[in-house]
């Protein structure tokens, strides 16, 4: 008889946890919640200290500080108790630092010697560092890459001047080394790391870095701009050209990394979709470092010459909206996220948001009598909401060489599938029993089940007939639903295209009948368009989803009561029956079958241009899905990151003279990096047959590599090629 399997040592771990407590082993499986995950990381750090010959139980270590930071906003009782326990330890125990002999749990980073700046240049900087050394030491206990937590409403970390000493740094990522002019403060990393865990799970850490260029804003003022193109919609039948809206244009810019192409290269995505079955969004963090600020002056000579100078006193303003106070404005919907090429500099998008307005546009067509009704009413005083970053979000001032870290945000989202379903209602449950089977090879027209249709057993919802067929038998629910494709609704602010869940269904050649709702993306050279393309016309693609929504409008019909066979013209409504006698307008164009029995898959991730996560609506009845992103944050979402070159004034500035400030032309280049962590489930093969996977052919292989002048493009990739059963 085989000996019993050894059970992992649990130690003094309270119920509901696997690692929160002393004496447990490190092989208990996946943590149960964020506090338990912090405890596991803490235990791993303690194990590393013990292996190096140090006793962390007698000292307060950086691992203890990281646990305090990660449980600062813990909602569970265990996390709260652990948080205050280590705060008490911090008050009484001597400090143990991370050195080469005292390891931490972050990725190992070898300290590098850097040249010490000339003392005659930085003597004032050294005095300032000495005065603030205590605070700097506390800041360095929780660098970004060591897992600092971004709490709801908490303060991000600004590490602008750290202890220099001999120039040796500690900690992973951008947390080590000395700050200041001429000294690097971070690393440039665009690797995707796959860590294979137990039970078929994979931890995917996507690192991304970009050089970001930011000009000073055209104006330091907030502006309310009314866009009014009533000349276009004054023409009959042109309602869809309506662009009327009001927006607040701000002097800030938005650093938005919420697109798949920011994080994964085409090879990464191929590996993920070919080997994984689902993705879980875990955490997100980002950092700004190596800030450079320069002024631009122009000579009076002809032709004029521009001179660029470093400005060590100019400031870069940074604000993290961790409480989501500002309007949520994901940039992927406008293709204005950070660029997808790590080696190319990118720009943040100017930040703006919608402002309330009312208007009336009555639909028309070319045969409508009279002039189209198109009235702009303006803003309702009851609905005015004017937001400014300066009085709503803490703003941090960075100078040359400074850095800023957001800490870690943990997501609360449902997983995203990387497989598609093909089963519709006609493929659910037990097929009918066949009285006889084919006797010859290749027979494809086996026409009769063998039992007369009005004598079969089973369940239907047909009230006055005994026929049981594949068309009439009762199924458990409705897979997908019929929805109108080109349907525009109207609000008090104008018409809008009704969003629908995209999916396969209907003839691709006739979109008016197909009602697929596949998203169509338009983008420029930063986001996949061929890099040598000239002109303003963007490149486009339509993402044709593999999911079968269950709808096929060409085959719909409505049967009259009472049921009759065969049906006559008076007993049935077909897709070919027009509405109002208009050619091509059929009842299926307005037919919606969504209801409580509807089964529907989530939207697919669209690589590279699609949005990754979205913010949940602040409504009492919330949508089950969002069509623009597969991950919907259940409570909070990562705070938006805003940047702005601070006003660099001249001596001619007079606040009473003009609305425009007299400013020195200033711009900033800074390095941005982020880390986005997923957990994925390896896809198991349960079928005999091999399946189609994401691949390329000879014709499109060279889209992914540059030509002799550097021209290249990014071609979108499918994300749900592998099939799965849904019932």
From Swiss-Prot:
It comes from the Viruses. Residues 19-64 are annotated as: Phospholipase A2-like. Keywords: Capsid protein, Clathrin-mediated endocytosis of virus by host, Cytoplasmic inwards viral transport, Disulfide bond, Host nucleus, Host-virus interaction, Magnesium, Metal-binding, Microtubular inwards viral transport, T=1 icosahedral capsid protein, Viral attachment to host cell, Viral penetration into host cytoplasm, Viral penetration into host nucleus, Viral penetration via permeabilization of host membrane, Virion, Virus endocytosis by host, Virus entry into host cell. GO terms for biological process: clathrin-dependent endocytosis of virus by host cell; microtubule-dependent intracellular transport of viral material towards nucleus; symbiont entry into host cell via permeabilization of host membrane; viral penetration into host nucleus; virion attachment to host cell. Residues 1-10 have a biased composition (Basic residues). The keyword Metal-binding applies. Its main location: virion. The keyword Metal-binding applies. One of its GO terms (molecular function) is metal ion binding. Residues 166-183 have a biased composition (Gly residues). It is found in: Virion; Host nucleus. Residues 25-35 have a biased composition (Polar residues). A motif (Nuclear localization signal) lies at residues 4-13. One of its GO terms (cellular component) is T=1 icosahedral viral capsid. Disulfide bonds join 633-637. Pfam families: Parvo_coat, Phospholip_A2_4. Residues 1-38, 95-120, 141-184 are annotated as: Disordered. InterPro entries: Capsid/spike_ssDNA_virus, Parvovirus_coat, Phospholipase_A2-like, VP1/VP2. Mg(2+) binds at residue 323. Belongs to the parvoviridae capsid protein family. The N-terminus of VP1 is sequestered within the mature capsid. It contains a phospholipase A2-like region and nuclear localization signals that might be exposed by capsid modifications during virus entry. Interacts with host TFRC. The capsids of autonomous parvoviruses expose a proportion of VP2 N-terminus and part of that sequence can be cleaved of to form VP3. Capsid protein self-assembles to form an icosahedral capsid with a T=1 symmetry, about 22 nm in diameter, and consisting of 60 copies of two size variants of the capsid proteins, VP1 and VP2, which differ by the presence of an N-terminal extension in the minor protein VP1. The capsid encapsulates the genomic ssDNA. Capsid proteins are responsible for the attachment to host cell receptors. This attachment induces virion internalization predominantly through clathrin-dependent endocytosis. This is Capsid protein VP1. It comes from Feline panleukopenia virus (strain 193) (FPV).
């Amino acid at each position: 008889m085989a000996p019993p399997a050894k059970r992992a040592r649990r130690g003094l771990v309270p119920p509901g946890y696997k690692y929160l407590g002393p004496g447990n082993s490190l092989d208990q499986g996946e943590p149960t919640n964020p506090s338990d995950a912090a405890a596991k990381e803490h235990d791993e750090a303690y194990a590393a200290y013990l292996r190096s010959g140090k006793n962390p139980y007698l000292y307060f270590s950086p691992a203890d500080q990281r646990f305090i930071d990660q449980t600062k906003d813990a909602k569970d009782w265990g996390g709260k108790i652990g948080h205050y326990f280590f705060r008490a330890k911090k008050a009484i125990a001597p400090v143990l630092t991370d050195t080469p002999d005292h390891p931490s749990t972050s990725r190992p980073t070898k300290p590098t010697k850097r040249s010490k700046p000339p003392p005659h240049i930085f003597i004032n900087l050294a005095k300032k560092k000495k005065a603030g050394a205590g605070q700097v030491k506390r800041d360095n206990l929780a660098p970004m890459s060591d897992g600092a937590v971004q709490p709801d409403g908490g303060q991000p970390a600004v590490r602008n001047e750290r202890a220099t000493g001999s120039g040796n740094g500690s900690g992973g990522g951008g947390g080590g080394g000395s700050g200041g002019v001429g000294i690097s403060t971070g690393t440039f990393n665009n690797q995707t790391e796959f860590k294979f865990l137990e039970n078929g799970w994979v931890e995917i850490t996507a690192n991304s870095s970009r050089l970001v260029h930011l000009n000073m804003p055209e104006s330091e003022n907030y502006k309310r701009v009314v866009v009014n193109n009533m000349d276009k919609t004054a023409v009959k039948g042109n309602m869809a050209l309506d662009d009327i809206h009001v927006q607040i244009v701000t002097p800030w810019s938005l650093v938005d990394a919420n697109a798949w192409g920011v994080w994964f290269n085409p090879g990464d995505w191929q590996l993920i979709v070919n080997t994984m079955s689902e993705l879980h969004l875990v955490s997100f963090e980002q950092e700004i470092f190596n800030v450079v600020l320069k002024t631009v002056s122009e000579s009076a000579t002809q032709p004029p010459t521009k001179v660029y100078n470093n400005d060590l006193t100019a400031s870069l303003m940074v604000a993290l909206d961790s409480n989501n106070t500002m309007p949520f404005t994901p940039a992927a919907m406008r293709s204005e996220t950070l660029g997808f090429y790590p080696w190319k500099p990118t720009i943040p998008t100017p930040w703006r948001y919608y402002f309330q307005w009312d208007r009336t546009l009555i639909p028309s067509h070319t045969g409508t009598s009279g002039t189209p009704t198109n009235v702009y009413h303006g803003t309702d005083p009851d609905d005015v909401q004017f937001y400014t970053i300066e009085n709503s979000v803490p703003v941090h001032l960075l100078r040359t060489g400074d850095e800023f870290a957001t800490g870690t945000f943990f997501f609360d989202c449902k997983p995203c599938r990387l497989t598609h379903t093909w089963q519709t209602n006609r493929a659910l449950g037990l097929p009918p029993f066949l009285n006889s089977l084919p006797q010859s090879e290749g027979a494809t027209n086996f026409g009769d089940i063998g039992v007369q249709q009005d004598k079969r057993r089973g369940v239907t919802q047909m009230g006055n007939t005994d026929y049981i067929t594949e068309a009439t038998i009762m199924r458990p629910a409705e897979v997908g639903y019929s929805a109108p494709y080109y349907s525009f609704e109207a609000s008090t602010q104008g018409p809008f295209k009704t969003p629908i869940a995209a999916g396969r269904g209907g003839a691709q050649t006739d979109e008016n009948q197909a009602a697929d709702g596949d998203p169509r993306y338009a983008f420029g050279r930063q986001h996949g368009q061929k890099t040598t393309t000239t002109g303003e016309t963007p490149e486009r693609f339509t993402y044709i989803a593999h999911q079968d929504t269950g709808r096929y409008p060409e085959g719909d019909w409505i049967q009259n009561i009472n049921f009759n066979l065969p049906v006559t013209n008076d007993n049935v409504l077909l897709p070919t029956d027009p509405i109002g006698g208009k050619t091509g307008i059929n009842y299926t164009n307005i037919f919606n079958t969504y209801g409580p029995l509807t089964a529907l898959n989530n939207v697919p991730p669209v690589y590279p241009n699609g949005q990754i996560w979205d913010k949940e609506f602040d409504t009492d009845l919330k949508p089950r899905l969002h069509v623009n992103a597969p991950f919907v944050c259940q409570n909070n979402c990562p705070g938006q990151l805003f940047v702005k070159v601070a006003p660099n004034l001249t001596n001619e500035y007079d606040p009473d003279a003009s609305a425009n400030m007299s400013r020195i032309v200033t711009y900033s280049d800074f390095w941005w990096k982020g880390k986005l962590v997923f957990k994925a489930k390896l896809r198991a093969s349960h079928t005999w047959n091999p399946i189609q996977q994401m691949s390329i052919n000879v014709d499109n292989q060279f889209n992914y590599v540059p030509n002799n002048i550097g021209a290249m493009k990014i071609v979108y990739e499918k994300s749900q090629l592998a099939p799965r059963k849904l019932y």
